[in-house]
Amino acid sequence: MDTQTHSLPITHTQLHSNSQPQSRTCTRHCQTFSQSCRQSHRGSRSQSSSQSPASHRNPTGAHSSSGHQSQSPNTSPPPKRHKKTMNSHHSPMRPTILHCRCPKNRKNLEGKLKKKKMAKRIQQVYKTKTRSSGWKSN
């Protein structure tokens, strides 16, 4: 019976030893992520041109892996560049923040998204009210 009681704490410590590296890797990931966020914010404020080539590098890297599109790089990037330039300020930040499990970033992101959703909702309600009142008065 002594061996069984000794085996239980060993497995318990093994569980803790397995969970600690995961938490360490998460904190390391969050720390590196927050540093990259700060650098990207600084870059977007001071050097907006430095961020645009980085956003163009990602699509070209994706095209080179596909093979077919890498043969004609001159024809495919222009329409994609137009799409990327419109979303370049928002899209690179969203997926990276969502993947990080830092509670501070998640709360900030949720607050920003809620504000945007509420603003869109208010605009939609206002439009529908003005349309419905316009139809009734005419």
From Swiss-Prot:
Zn(2+) binds at residues 12, 16, 26, 30. Keywords: Chromosome, Developmental protein, Differentiation, DNA-binding, Metal-binding, Nucleosome core, Nucleus, Phosphoprotein, Spermatogenesis, Zinc. Residues 1-138 are annotated as: Disordered. Coiled coil: none annotated. One of its GO terms (cellular component) is nucleosome. Expressed by spermatids (at protein level). InterPro entries: TP2. GO terms for molecular function: DNA binding; zinc ion binding. Residues 45-72 have a biased composition (Low complexity). The modification Phosphoserine is found at residue 133. Residues 1-33, 125-138 have a biased composition (Polar residues). It is found in: Nucleus; Nucleus, Nucleolus; Chromosome. One of its GO terms (biological process) is sperm DNA condensation. A motif (Nuclear localization signal) lies at residues 111-119. Its main location: nucleus. PANTHER family: NUCLEAR TRANSITION PROTEIN 2. Belongs to the nuclear transition protein 2 family. Plays a key role in the replacement of histones to protamine in the elongating spermatids of mammals. In condensing spermatids, loaded onto the nucleosomes, where it promotes the recruitment and processing of protamines, which are responsible for histone eviction. This is Nuclear transition protein 2.
